């Protein structure tokens, strides 16, 4: 009975996640009615005088109560954790592989941090050259971070270094801040990189000792003290790494740069070395302490000599100029890597835990469509798009993810499909889904109309009528994209 109750409640949870319905209480009421009849049928034996019958009744009542507790509390809690977090739906639900790699990475991180802290204590009491001990510590620390990052082999990592940066010349390294792992991404690049960190990390009970021995710089020390400490480390050949945004970005967008990093580079008379991190916010979001698979790209840009005044004369002007330059370069990285293939996993995962048939249909459909790369290629990056017969919304989501300047309206006759499409975590204000008959509906003016495998469901006269309606609402230099089955190839269709 416990299995039956769990399946029944799970069905309610899946229906709620799939369609956005809040109807779990009706499933619980049905379970409670079954529990009541079971207790009345078997639990009444507790009043029997025969000890065996009483034992059976007591065990039945305890068993039923336990089953109901698990079904009503633990089961919904686990499902909720799989698909939601504190800000709403997860943009990609938790999967078994991601969970396993998250646990392994967590244990490796904690174990590595404690070992490095112990190693720091040992080095402190060994009578040897301080600089050599520090260098050994930094080399091992860098290798450990490399191991931790590359441990999750399901997530590809790319380091793009077109200018052959070797970090031999000290610099102020700046990078966008997306997740906790950004520090390790910087440390694995070279052992001679020190990071300016906050007091929470500096005095952390797990990795604080290792960070302090590695001579990371405490942000709370104040600018004068920080400059003094940084100047000494620069003389020893180290580069100083600072996140000019100050805080992690949950969306991946570049936030406002603070001028402290550039002031420090000016005072120390060293270059600024910009490094772009892309994809890390999707692997470990700021508001979601859980590792997911994804491609992480680290791009090292050319050094900037502030004394040449290429980005302005004052520190304020240089900060704004470098921020604008950084945003432009980040946009180039996005356009290079945020392709339909990059986003296909996001779309597939949004239809996970919504039923096995839909899950497999989604995977097969997107694979057969080759991630909708052709549509993304021919549809303008900035356009108003109406997708007639949008189905579950796969194409609409792909077009919206690959360009934030596409405004999309998806229309389909099937109300259930529209409900499913509307209830995805990746849905944003770019997309509007409408249930209705495209023959009767009035269309909004659009730059692009898409009729993808739709017209063959209509007779010829309605096909012509639908196309004429699209033409009437088409903007100047707009396009109508029609793809449909060829009846002459009926056996292959």
Model-derived features: positions:
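A conserved beta-strand element that flanks and buttresses the S-adenosyl-L-methionine
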Residues: 450
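A short glycine-rich, Lys/Arg-flanked "PGG" loop and its adjoining helix->strand segment in the class I
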Residues: 464-476
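Catalytic core of membrane glycerolipid acyltransferases/transacylases, capturing the structured
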Residues: 120-138, 167-222
């Amino acid at each position: 009975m416990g299995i039956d109750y769990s399946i029944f409640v799970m069905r309610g949870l899946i229906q709620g996640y799939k369609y956005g319905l809040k109807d779990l209480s009706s499933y619980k009421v049905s379970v409670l009615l079954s529990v009541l009849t079971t207790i009345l049928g078997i639990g009444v034996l507790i009043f029997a005088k025969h000890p065996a019958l009483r034992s059976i009744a007591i065990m039945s009542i305890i068993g039923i109560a336990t089953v109901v507790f698990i079904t009503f509390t633990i089961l919904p809690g686990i499902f909720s954790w799989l698909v939601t977090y504190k800000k709403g739906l997860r943009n990609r639900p938790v999967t078994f592989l991601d969970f396993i790699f998250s646990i392994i990475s967590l244990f490796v991180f904690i174990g590595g941090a404690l070992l490095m802290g112990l190693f720091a204590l040992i080095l402190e009491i060994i009578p040897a050259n301080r600089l050599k001990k520090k260098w050994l510590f930094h080399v091992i620390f860098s290798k450990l971070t490399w191991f931790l990052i590359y441990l999750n082999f399901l997530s590809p990592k790319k380091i793009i270094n077109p200018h052959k940066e070797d970090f031999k010349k000290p610099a102020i390294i700046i990078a966008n801040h997306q997740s906790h792992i950004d520090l390790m991404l910087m440390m694995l690049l070279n052992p001679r990189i020190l990071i300016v960190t906050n007091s929470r990390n500096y005095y952390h009970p797990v990795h604080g000792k290792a960070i302090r021995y590695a001579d990371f710089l405490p942000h709370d020390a104040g600018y004068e003290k920080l400059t003094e400490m940084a100047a000494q480390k620069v003389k020893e050949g180290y580069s100083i790494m600072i996140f000019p945004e100050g805080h992690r970005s949950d969306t991946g967008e570049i936030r406002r740069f603070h001028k402290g990093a550039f002031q420090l580079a000016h005072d120390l008379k060293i270059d600024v070395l910009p490094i772009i991190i892309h994809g890390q916010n999707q692997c470990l979001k700021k508001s979601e302490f859980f590792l997911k698979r994804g491609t992480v790209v680290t791009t090292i840009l050319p050094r900037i000599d502030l004394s040449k005044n290429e980005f302005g004369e004052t520190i304020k002007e240089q900060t704004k100029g470098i921020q604008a330059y950084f945003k432009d370069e980040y946009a180039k990285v996005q356009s290079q890597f945020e392709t339909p293939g990059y986003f296909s996993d996001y779309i597939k995962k949004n239809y996970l835990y919504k039923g096995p048939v839909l899950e497999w249909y989604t995977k097969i459909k997107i694979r057969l469509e080759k991630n909708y790369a052709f549509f993304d290629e021919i549809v303008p990056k900035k356009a108003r798009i109406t997708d007639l017969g949008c189905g579950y919304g796969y194409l609409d989501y792909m077009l919206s993810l690959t360009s934030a300047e596409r405004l999309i309206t998806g229309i389909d006759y099937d109300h259930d499909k529209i409900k499913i499409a509307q209830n995805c975590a990746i849905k944003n204000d770019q997309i509007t889904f409408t249930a209705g008959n495209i023959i009767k509906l009035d269309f909004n003016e659009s730059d692009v109309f898409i009729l993808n495998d739709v017209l063959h469901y209509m007779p010829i006269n309605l096909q012509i009528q639908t196309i004429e309606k699209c033409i009437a609402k088409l903007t100047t230099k707009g396009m109508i994209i029609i793809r449909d089955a060829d009846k002459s190839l009926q056996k292959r269709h």
